[in-house]
Structures are given as structure tokens and as C-alpha cells.
């Protein structure tokens, strides 16, 4: 279990991202803001995305909110989702492309959130994680990977994405960020698929 938290060759960025998210969560717990869940006011003070303040010059919130979570179950679910996709995507993409896709889709997901919601305090890595799944989905649909690999993970990816989007309609979940991350990741996947396929064929 501990190996998933230790950066190593081919799996370097994902453990760092998981550790950063956990450190922010632990810091908020130590600060006395809660454990099972945090109040919106405290999240806002720590860097949550909130349209009235974000568009008023605090654009850094588009990034900082992606390293924060609303409570225990929120961070556990997101880190599991990040671990699952990161294990397969990071070795294929390499550190630079992987982190670039993660941060880009995370920020675009935050933009989608403030475009859709006028006064919602939003936090979580799920927009960026959905971005990775969107990218993964595009590459699977375009058959970038070998058939046996693609079939196995296309089903699990569709189940993960579908389940989480449906859960978003139950309330309290930022589906705008999920959809924004998913679409932006999918588009990036479409753009990069040809190059990635050539890279995989060369490395065989």
C-alpha cells in the first residue's frame, strides 16, 4: 500500500499529487476545521473556488481549490480515482505531459464551475481527475492502445465516469467541474492520440 505514496520511475507525479492533497486535508484537520466535513467558510478562507471572489482578481483559486476537499469521503474517493487512472496513464505519457494535462484540465474545470454556478463554494481534485479520465477515454475510443488493454479499461472508465456524473445530480457535487474536466481532457486526448499511438508503436 505504501508504494503508492512513494514517487518512483514511471510513477512519479501521481504519488506527489496524492501526497499534496492529503497534506492539505491533514493541515485543515489539525487546524481544527473538522474531519468528516469542512464548513464552506473555512474552505473559502483556504482557497476554494467561489465566483464572486475568483473573478474579482483572486484567479489563483482556480488552481488552489483542486488541492482541497470538503471532507474525508470526498478526498478518499478522489484519491482512489486518481490512483486508478494514474497507474496506467502516467507511465504512458511521461511526467511532463501527465502533469500538464492534470493541471490544465483542473483549471478548465474550475472555469466551468464559475461559469455555471454564481455562488457555490467549490473544492476538489475531481475536475482534474475527470480530465485524466476524459483523456483516457479518448485514447481508448481511438484505439491508441492494444485491443486487449483497451477493452478492459474502456468499460471500467465508462462505469467510473457514468457513476460519478449520476452522483452529481444528487446535490452537493460540482458536476460543472466534472463535465468541464471530462470534456477538456477528451479534447486534449483527441489532439494527442495520433502522436501517442506513434510513440507506443516505436517503443514496442
Positions of PLM-derived features:
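C-terminal transmembrane module of polytopic alpha-helical membrane proteins
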Residues: 1-16, 20-22, 162-204
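N-terminal TM1-TM2 helical hairpin plus the immediately adjacent luminal interfacial "cap"
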Residues: 10-123, 170-173
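Select subsegments of transmembrane alpha-helices in polytopic membrane proteins
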Residues: 13-14, 152-156
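Transmembrane alpha-helical segments of multi-pass membrane transport proteins and ion-pumping complexes
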Residues: 29, 106-110, 114, 132-135, ...
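Alpha-helical transmembrane segments that form the membrane-embedded catalytic/substrate-binding core
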Residues: 75-82, 123-135, 173-193
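Alpha-helical transmembrane bundle and helix-membrane interface signal
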Residues: 91-95, 138-154, 194-203
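Central hydrophobic cores of alpha-helical transmembrane segments
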Residues: 102-105, 156-161
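Alpha-helical transmembrane segments of multi-pass integral membrane proteins
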Residues: 119-121, 125-150
Amino acid at each position: 500500500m505504501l508504494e503508492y505514496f512513494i514517487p518512483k520511475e514511471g510513477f512519479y507525479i501521481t504519488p506527489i499529487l496524492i501526497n499534496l492533497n492529503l497534506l492539505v486535508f491533514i493541515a485543515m484537520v489539525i487546524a481544527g476545521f473538522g474531519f468528516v466535513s469542512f464548513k464552506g467558510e473555512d474552505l473559502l478562507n483556504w482557497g476554494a473556488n467561489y465566483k464572486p471572489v475568483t473573478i474579482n482578481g483572486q484567479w489563483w483559486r482556480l488552481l488552489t481549490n483542486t488541492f482541497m476537499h470538503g471532507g474525508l469521503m470526498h478526498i478518499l474517493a478522489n484519491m482512489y480515482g486518481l490512483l486508478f487512472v494514474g497507474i496506467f496513464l502516467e507511465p504512458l505519457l511521461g511526467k511532463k505531459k501527465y502533469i500538464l494535462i492534470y493541471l490544465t484540465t483542473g483549471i478548465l474545470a474550475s472555469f466551468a464551475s464559475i461559469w455555471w454556478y454564481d455562488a457555490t463554494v467549490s473544492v476538489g481534485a475531481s475536475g482534474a481527475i475527470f480530465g485524466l479520465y476524459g483523456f483516457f477515454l479518448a485514447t481508448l475510443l481511438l484505439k491508441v492502445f492494444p485491443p486487449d488493454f483497451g477493452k478492459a479499461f474502456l468499460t471500467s472508465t465508462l462505469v467510473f465516469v457514468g457513476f460519478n456524473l449520476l452522483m452529481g445530480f444528487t446535490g452537493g457535487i460540482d458536476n460543472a467541474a466534472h463535465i468541464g474536466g471530462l470534456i477538456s481532457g477528451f479534447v486534449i486526448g483527441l489532439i494527442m492520440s495520433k502522436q501517442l499511438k506513434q510513440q507506443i508503436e516505436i517503443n514496442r
